[in-house]
Amino acid sequence: MGLTSWLFGGGKSPQEQLRAHQRSLGRAERELDRERTKLDQRERALIQEIKGSAKAGNTGAARIQARDLMRLRNSRKKMMNAKTQLQAISLRLQTMRTSEQMMQSMRGATRLLTGMNKSMNIPAMARITQQFERENEIMEQRQEMIDENMDDALEEDDEEEADELVNKVLDEIGVDLSQGLPDAATQIGTVPELKTEDNLQARLDELAKR
């Protein structure tokens, strides 16, 4: 099923179909906002847990919690990307609604002028009718360009590096990832070298004395 069939299928008018789809998108955006609030609360709790584990010298727990926080932030980022796409689609639908209204008005004016031209047979009215028809074609071409540009924009999706997410939270508690915790994106399940363990333990011991 193409986009046009999805938008304007059924017994409803195009305007009614567009309004219904916009309401559905609005509900989806609100649900994403609620989920983001829950993730924000969980993030704050995880940061406190990481700080507590670091001060207690619990290296293993700090690693696990840092990876959990990394996954949480990745999930939130994907959620925000999804919301951005929903907003872009909603804007596209609104643009289509506006364009549809304008084209309907122009078609109505064109039909009116055509009828007047037939009854009055005035060359000036014929020129005005031709101008309206040209403007109508331009509007349709612009709508096609808007659709193509919006499709290109929806395909863009940036991805953050996982180690940057872990580094950020560990910087907050005074632990340097390059000297302490292993990179969560590449070293999960591996055994760190003894020197790395010693460096991390020393930093955790120092943090616990603060």
Curated annotation (Swiss-Prot):
Q: Which InterPro entries does the UniProt entry name for this protein?
A: Snf7_fam (IPR005024)
Question: Per the database entry, which stretches of residues form a coiled coil?
Answer: 15-97
Q: Where in the cell is it found?
A: Cytoplasm; Endosome membrane
What is the protein's major site of localization? cytoplasm
Q: Where is the composition biased (Basic and acidic residues)?
A: 26-38
Instruction: Keywords in alphabetical order, please.
Output: Coiled coil, Cytoplasm, Endosome, Membrane, Phosphoprotein, Protein transport, Transport
Q: How does it sit in the membrane?
A: Peripheral membrane protein
Q: Which domain of life is it from?
A: Eukaryota
What GO cellular-component annotations does this UniProt entry give?
Answer: cytoplasm; ESCRT III complex; mitotic spindle pole body attachment site; multivesicular body
Q: Per the UniProt entry, what is one GO biological process?
A: late endosome to vacuole transport
Q: What happens when the gene is disrupted?
A: Leads to multivesicular bodies sorting defects.
Note down the stretches annotated as region Disordered: 1-38
Q: Which family does it belong to?
A: Belongs to the SNF7 family.
Its subunit composition reads: Core component of the ESCRT-III complex (endosomal sorting required for transport complex III). ESCRT-III appears to be sequentially assembled as a flat lattice on the endosome membrane.
| PANTHER family found in the cross-reference section | CHARGED MULTIVESICULAR BODY PROTEIN (PTHR10476)
Task of the protein: Required for the sorting and concentration of proteins resulting in the entry of these proteins into the invaginating vesicles of the multivesicular body (MVB). Acts a component of the ESCRT-III complex, which appears to be critical for late steps in MVB sorting, such as membrane invagination and final cargo sorting and recruitment of late-acting components of the sorting machinery. The MVB pathway requires the sequential function of ESCRT-O, -I,-II and -III complex assemblies.
- What is the recorded name of this protein? ESCRT-III complex subunit did4
Source lineage: Eukaryota, Fungi, Dikarya, Ascomycota, Taphrinomycotina
